[in-house]
Swiss-Prot record:
Folate-binding protein involved in regulating the level of ATP-DnaA and in the modification of some tRNAs. It is probably a key factor in regulatory networks that act via tRNA modification, such as initiation of chromosomal replication. It is found in: Cytoplasm. The keyword NADP does not apply. Keywords: Cytoplasm, Folate-binding, tRNA processing. Folate binds at residues 27, 189. The gene is ygfZ. This is tRNA-modifying protein YgfZ. GO terms for cellular component: cytoplasm. The keyword tRNA processing applies. Belongs to the tRNA-modifying YgfZ family. It comes from Escherichia coli (strain SMS-3-5 / SECEC).
Length: 326
């Protein structure tokens, strides 16, 4: 990608975030084009893509035959097919898996590094973009296309926008916003996704979890009414037989080091500590607070105390902006 990522600054929680323009270099874009695109994706992901309109984007999972996620995909219609955004660390293996059956279909599946991914969030993000685009996405119309640019709207943790565009437009936006907006890199967007409870699947956790273990059903990413797709049997069993005992949790507090994706944490049990969970992502904010996204048992007590392994500091559960009640 020729567009240079912005230098990192310590991320800020959404409630205190000034207007910020971010390069999303840790995320990557991929596309499927061709006459069979919709039919092909319908047989591969957990969401009902046949019901998706041009105005929608959604988080879907791409699973193996056992229902474990290769990755999750932020999916939207693009040209005569679909595009999706996923963590850069999983794109290549995810595309390899997706292409396995493509030889029998009229589709082309490819990474897209020509386009640039930017995020805009923070104080008066909408007002800042309203000067630059004739229409912005909203709750009613979550995807808007203008020229070479696609804008995606997100409600949580606070209104923000993901921009998929060409290099020239990315440079124009940077020049226009440079004076009023702080510039930051992917870590700020990652912090917002953790706060929003959007599961982050990096390479360390690819092939490890069924979608429900990361709350995908609560985010509208699983259709239980559509026809078959890879891994469907296991995903359905988890719902209808209550086979899923895990959920995605948000922890905040302090830690002397950031836990890495794939690492476990420790849960306080009386005087002792017991290993628990799998970390998906963690970020340290500019106020020193650590935010951790972790998959753990879905029956954790809300006042449980956790820590990074052998650490002197502690972490506690924070509520997510959505409900897991079915």
């Amino acid at each position: 990608m020729a567009f240079t990522p912005f230098p990192p600054r310590q991320p800020t929680a959404s409630a205190r975030l000034p207007l910020t323009l971010m390069t999303l270099d840790d995320w990557a874009l991929a596309t499927i084009t061709g006459a069979d695109s919709e039919k092909y994706m319908q047989g591969q992901v957990t969401a009902d893509v046949s019901q998706m309109t041009e105005d929608q984007h959604l988080l879907a999972a791409h699973c193996d035959a056992k229902g474990k996620m290769w990755s999750n995909l932020r999916l939207f219609r693009d040209g005569d097919g679909f595009a999706w955004i996923e963590r850069r660390s999983v794109r290549e293996p995810q595309l390899t898996e997706l292409k396995k059956y493509a030889v029998f279909s009229k589709v082309t599946i490819a990474p897209d590094d020509e386009r640039v991914l930017l995020g805009v969030a923070g104080f008066q993000a909408r007002a800042a973009l309203a000067n630059l685009f004739s229409e912005l996405p909203s709750k009613e119309k979550q995807v808007v296309k203008e020229g070479a640019t696609t804008l995606l709207w997100f409600e949580h943790p606070a209104e923000r926008f993901l921009i998929v565009t060409d290099e020239a437009t990315a440079n124009m936006l940077t020049d226009k916003l440079r004076g009023e907006a702080e510039l930051n890199n992917s870590q700020q967007w990652l912090a917002l996704n953790i706060e929003a409870g959007f599961p982050v699947i990096d390479a360390a956790n690819s092939g490890q979890f069924i979608p429900q273990a990361t709350n995908l059903q609560a985010l509208g990413g699983i259709s239980f009414k559509k026809g078959c797709y890879t891994g469907q049997e296991m995903v359905a069993r988890a719902k209808f037989r209550g086979a899923n005992k895990r959920a995605l949790w948000l922890l905040t507090g302090s830690a002397s080091r950031l836990p890495e994706a794939g690492e476990d944490l420790e849960l306080k049990m009386g005087e002792n500590w017991r290993r628990t969970g799998t970390v998906l992502a963690a970020v340290k904010l500019e106020d020193g607070q650590v935010v951790v996204q972790v998959v753990m048992n879905n029956d954790m007590e809300p006042d449980s105390i956790f820590r990074v392994r052998d650490d002197a500091n502690t972490l506690r559960i924070e509520p997510l902006p959505y409900s897991l009640e079915e």
